[in-house]
């Protein structure tokens, strides 16, 4: 019984710290199709891999922008993603495609979406 309590407590603390770190990240304002969004900035491999996984709500941002150092085809998925996302594929600040990525709860399985052409930025907007 004590092991279960310790594991549960550890998991709770880990998720709390993770949530705190995500909500305290750098943000930028980014305009897409005449609307300005406040976006969390991700510019490292670890952040690219996590994205908005395990996030159920963002208090200080509309979504996330992934800044990549190169232009190549991108693939995103909804593993452990609990919010619906509008995905914008961007090449040199021009939107080159858009996809919808449902939450894992709605899709009942992992869904993959791919950029139609190489992209050096990807924006995920939480779709309420």
Spell out what each predicted region is.
Residues 17-128:
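Compact, glycine-rich, soluble single-domain proteins
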Residues 1-3:
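N-terminal hydrophobic targeting signals that begin at the initiator methionine
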Residues 5-19:
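Hydrophobic membrane-insertion alpha-helices, especially the h-region
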């Amino acid at each position: 019984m004590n092991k279960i309590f310790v594991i549960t407590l550890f998991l709770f603390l880990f998720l709390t710290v993770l949530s705190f770190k995500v909500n305290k990240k750098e943000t930028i304002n980014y305009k897409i199709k005449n609307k300005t969004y406040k976006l969390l900035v991700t510019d490292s491999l670890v952040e690219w891999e996590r994205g908005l996984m395990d996030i159920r709500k963002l208090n200080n941002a509309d979504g996330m922008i992934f800044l990549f150092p190169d232009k190549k085809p991108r693939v995103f998925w909804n593993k452990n993603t609990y919010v619906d996302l509008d995905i914008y594929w961007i090449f040199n600040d021009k939107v080159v495609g858009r996809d919808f990525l449902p939450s894992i709860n709605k899709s009942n399985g992992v869904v993959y979406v791919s950029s139609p052409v190489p992209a050096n930025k990807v924006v995920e907007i939480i779709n309420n």
